[in-house]
């Protein structure tokens, strides 16, 4: 499993070419908190919407704790996406280590 820590992602987001962020959580979860500029594709819609992603882009997937996004990362790798990472610990770890102002749930 190729994962990226919250601190590594924070650093990558300030790069000239940041990764594409994809939030795989449910709609209600995105209303509580989310990362700026993330594309929201709920896990159950992924098969129908995968064409919205470029297989050549660096993609970082996230969810609440990293479990659902890990499953989607494996799915994308199986489709030939080369640079796919899962946010280790999801937004829960992000809120504890990078952004303590983010709402936790």
Question: What are the roles of these predicted feature ranges?
Answer:
Residues 1-20, 24-58, 67-105:
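Rhodanese-like catalytic fold shared by cysteine-dependent sulfurtransferases
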Residues 62-63:
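Short, surface-exposed ligand- or partner-binding patches at beta-edge/loop junctions that are enriched
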């Amino acid at each position: 499993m190729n994962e990226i820590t919250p601190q590594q992602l924070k650093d990558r987001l300030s790069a000239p070419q940041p990764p594409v962020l994809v939030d795989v959580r449910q709609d209600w979860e995105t209303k509580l908190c989310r990362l700026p500029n993330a594309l929201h594709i709920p896990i159950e819609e992924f098969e129908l919407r995968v064409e919205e992603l470029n297989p050549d882009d660096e993609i970082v997937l996230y969810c609440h704790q990293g479990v659902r996004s890990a499953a989607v990362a494996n799915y994308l790798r199986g489709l030939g996406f080369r640079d796919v990472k899962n946010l280790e610990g999801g937004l829960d770890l992000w809120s504890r280590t990078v952004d303590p102002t983010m709402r936790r749930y």
